[in-house]
């Protein structure tokens, strides 16, 4: 019996918010259930764009695609090796459909109000400063729009990290089910996009089939448990090797469900609020420093007066403790 569609898995916003604040060096992993995958999404992941398309995308204030860094993007192919991004002859959505066909997956009728989940979309990342360091080492990176970063070279550490994440995914979901694994170094923070078909076995026949619940549980409780275990496993097998702490799960948090555009807008808003908070702290620090300077000046004047005999010792002790 075909598995019924489940509610789309949430994208958690907590870890990346902490990355912007630079309070923790954490890994980040977000997973979302998908009922389809469009050619537009595939083109974005594989950067099958011309310059005009990139310029149009960058007109949106939430986007920052650096054309001078796009040559540094890469992907890990079905052979488990590093390749230039977009090296496949077939596009990502075509490869996904081929894998689904191999598993005899069929969606519900077109007019159905619900559809089964056919794959999982992952984003792997981490603390901004740490991932930038893994990708570019001590090279100077200008993250402003239209900046020229053509001098940058890709460091091996980001390749090792990506390969370790790939191996982690392959062990959990099967290498044959990793349809796409793209690493983007041309945006604000280096990150990975992984498109994975979730496969299980039919109870009676034992045949492999597309089955979301086989990997992510049959309900929210099971999903929460699995997600927490995934964060721990990813940290133990990958993150700890690169100085990244365990990421946050959804347990005990007010997790919001956001589409990508709304998610990026929230991150931008959080960044501005963080910048405002820092400026407030800087103002407070300057005021405290000014107050300390005035107090020190007053104390020096009192000590001079004491030395010249203008005030008595008892009066000096009283003024000193004020």
What is each model feature region?
Residues 1-322:
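N-terminal nicking endonuclease/strand-transfer module with a His-rich metal-binding environment
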């Amino acid at each position: 019996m075909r598995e019924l569609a489940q509610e789309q898995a949430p994208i958690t916003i907590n870890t990346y918010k902490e990355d912007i604040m630079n309070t923790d060096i954490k890994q980040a992993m977000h997973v979302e259930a998908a009922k389809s995958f469009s050619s537009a999404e595939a083109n974005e992941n594989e950067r099958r764009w011309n310059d005009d398309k990139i310029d149009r995308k960058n007109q949106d204030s939430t986007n920052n695609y650096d054309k001078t860094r796009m040559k540094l993007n890469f992907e890990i192919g079905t052979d488990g090796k590093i390749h230039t991004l977009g090296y496949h002859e077939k596009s990502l959505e075509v490869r996904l459909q081929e894998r689904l066909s191999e598993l005899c997956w069929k969606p519900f009728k077109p007019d159905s109000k619900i559809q089964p989940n056919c794959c999982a979309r992952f984003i792997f990342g981490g603390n901004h400063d740490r991932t930038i360091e893994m990708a570019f080492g001590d090279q100077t990176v200008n993250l402003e729009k239209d900046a020229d970063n053509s001098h940058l070279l890709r460091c091996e550490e980001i390749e090792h990290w990506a390969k370790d994440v790939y191996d982690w995914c392959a062990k959990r979901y099967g290498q044959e089910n990793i349809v796409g694994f793209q690493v983007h170094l041309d945006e604000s923070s280096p990150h990975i996009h992984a498109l994975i078909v979730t496969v299980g076995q039919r109870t009676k026949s034992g045949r492999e089939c597309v089955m979301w619940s086989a990997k992510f549980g049959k309900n929210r409780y099971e999903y929460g448990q699995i997600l927490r275990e995934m964060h721990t496993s990813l940290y133990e097998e990958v993150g700890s090797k690169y100085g990244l702490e365990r990421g946050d799960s959804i347990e005990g948090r007010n997790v919001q469900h956001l589409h990508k555009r709304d998610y990026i807008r929230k991150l931008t808003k959080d960044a501005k609020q963080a910048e405002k908070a820092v400026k407030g702290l800087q103002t407070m620090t300057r005021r405290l420093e000014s107050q300390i300077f005035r107090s020190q000046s007053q104390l020096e004047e009192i000590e001079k007066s004491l030395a010249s005999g203008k005030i008595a010792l008892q009066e000096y002790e009283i003024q000193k403790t004020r």
